[in-house]
A protein has these predicted regions:
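Surface-exposed loop/turn motifs in large extracellular/passenger domains
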Residues: 1-13, 20-49, 57-77, 82-102, ...
Length: 197
């Protein structure tokens, strides 16, 4: 399945209402076998207002290609670039990706995520979270994390968070983060926080 979207405006205002959702058909953890679903979205604006509502969401081994998007999320657990169980591949080039809700990083990775030439900003959350045997690569990006609010039982403010939750959403193993030609700003707390991975 291949879907291409260009110059669209998406707004959601319900719990669990992601802006654009790509599911590859595999419900197992980090299984590369999927139905080949690929979503390509370009030159578009995505706004989500409620909880559990990511901007672009990829699961089940799907492939998401995003180019020059303006993504804003306001709810809790609503990453601008979001992945979940089953992982997949996400490639983002250009655009602005902003979150204002608690537990809503600019990027939440249970997949292979590459972001290039983009602006990432989180107000009340970590900037980037990588869970389990997954990775995020930044190329020529700006990442700013204000991190004004702790979420749940968290006791530490942190920008780039690598961990293993044992929830089953991500395969066990070493998380990976790489940044080249990028500017990372941490307004509060640790820039890097690594635990249990």
């Amino acid at each position: 399945v291949n879907l291409t979207l260009n110059n669209i405006n998406v707004t959601t205002n319900a719990k669990g209402a992601n802006g654009v959702f790509c599911y590859g058909g595999s419900a197992t953890t980090n299984n590369s076998t999927s139905d080949g679903t690929t979503v390509t979205i370009k030159n578009s604006k995505i706004t989500t207002k409620a909880d559990n509502s990511g901007g672009i969401m990829t699961t089940g081994g799907g492939t998401m290609n995003a180019y020059n998007l303006t993504v804003k999320t306001a709810g809790t657990s609503s990453a601008a670039i979001r992945t979940d169980r089953g992982g997949g591949t996400v490639k983002v080039n250009k655009g602005t990706y902003t979150t204002t809700g608690k537990g809503s990083p600019a990027v939440y990775s249970t997949a292979d995520v590459t972001v290039s030439n983009a602006t990432l900003k989180a107000t009340a959350s970590e900037g980037i979270v990588i869970e389990g045997k997954n990775k995020v690569t930044l190329k020529n990006c700006t990442l700013t994390d204000n991190n004004t609010t702790l979420n749940g039982q968290s006791t530490t403010y942190k920008n780039i968070f690598l961990y293993q939750s044992m929830s089953g959403d991500a395969a066990s193993g070493s998380a990976s983060f790489k940044a080249t030609g990028s500017k990372i700003t941490t307004k509060k707390g640790d820039t890097f926080y690594i635990t249990n991975t």
